[in-house]
Every structure is written in structure tokens, then in C-alpha cells.
């Protein structure tokens, strides 16, 4: 009889308490996509909050800085621009990641810290999130 072998996603290098986990907020319109991405990012050791665009402005005002924001390709440009400007103004230590889609128009530089094609793999997403989380922790 063969034993089952479990292959984990990415494991955090060191165990952290839930309060010490880096915080990530993802904003999008597709509930299922947000749920799946949250599971993947959470498995790598992050606290993930998934919200819709209409909830984002209230979230910016509620929580202090030091987070990574992930903007899904399902958002419209005007939503992206308004949210990015609000976050930059209220929480300058936060880092912003834009997941791009096939039909994205050229967007102004400086709104986001990083861009990532939404069809890239999980490993690349986690690398970019990790890099931005370190930058946001240093910026606090």
C-alpha cells in the first residue's frame, strides 16, 4: 500500500504568531478568484483581507499602514486610480501591486509599486508579495 504524500504550497520560513503575520488586502470584483488567491497567499504566512472596491475606502481609513494591497485585473481604471491615490495619501508605507489583464490600457507610472501579469504562476505572485511586504515593513 502506498502512503499518501502531501506536497505543501510555500511554507513560511519561520513560524509567526497570527498578530505578527504581514497583512495583505486584495481588492477585486470576482468573489471566487479572491477566495482562491487568499488561500494561496494565506498558506505562505500572510493575513489576507479580501474586499470589493466599494469597501476599500473605508478600509483605508480604518487600519494603520504597513500593508500590501493587491489590485485584481477585474477592476476598472477609474477605481484603481482613485484607490491608489487614497492609499498613497493616507498610508504612504503601504505597497501596491497591480495584477494586469489582457485588455489593460497603458496606466500612469507611479500609481503602483509593482505590476504582475495575472496569468503568471503562484510562485511569482508570492515572490512579489514577499518583496513588497518587506518594503512596507521597512517603510513604517
Question: Locations of the language-model features?
Answer:
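Short, charged/polar "capping" segments at the starts of alpha-helices
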Residues: 32-35, 58-59, 77-79, 103-108
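Alpha4 helix (beta4-alpha4-beta5 surface) of REC/receiver domains from two-component response regulators
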Residues: 82, 97-123
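Short hydrophobic/Thr-rich beta-strand motif most characteristic of the beta2 strand and flanking loop
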Residues: 45-55
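Structural motif
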Residues: 26-31, 53, 71-75, 99-102, ...
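Short, structured coil segments at secondary-structure junctions
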Residues: 44, 92, 110-112
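Hydrophobic anchor at the start of a short beta-strand
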Residues: 48, 94-96
Amino acid at each position: 500500500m502506498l502512503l499518501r504524500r502531501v506536497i505543501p504550497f510555500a511554507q513560511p520560513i519561520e513560524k509567526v504568531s497570527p498578530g505578527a503575520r504581514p497583512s495583505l488586502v486584495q481588492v477585486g470584483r470576482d468573489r471566487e478568484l479572491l477566495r482562491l488567491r487568499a488561500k494561496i497567499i494565506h498558506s505562505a504566512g500572510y493575513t489576507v483581507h479580501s474586499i470589493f472596491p466599494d469597501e476599500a475606502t473605508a478600509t483605508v481609513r480604518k487600519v494603520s499602514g504597513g500593508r500590501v494591497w493587491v489590485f485584481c485585473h477585474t477592476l476598472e481604471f477609474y477605481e484603481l486610480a482613485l484607490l491608489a491615490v487614497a492609499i498613497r495619501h493616507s498610508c504612504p508605507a503601504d505597497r501596491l501591486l497591480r495584477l494586469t489583464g489582457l485588455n489593460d490600457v497603458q496606466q500612469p507610472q507611479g500609481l503602483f509599486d509593482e505590476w504582475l501579469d495575472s496569468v503568471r504562476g503562484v510562485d511569482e505572485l508570492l515572490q512579489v508579495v514577499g518583496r513588497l511586504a518587506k518594503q512596507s515593513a521597512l517603510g513604517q
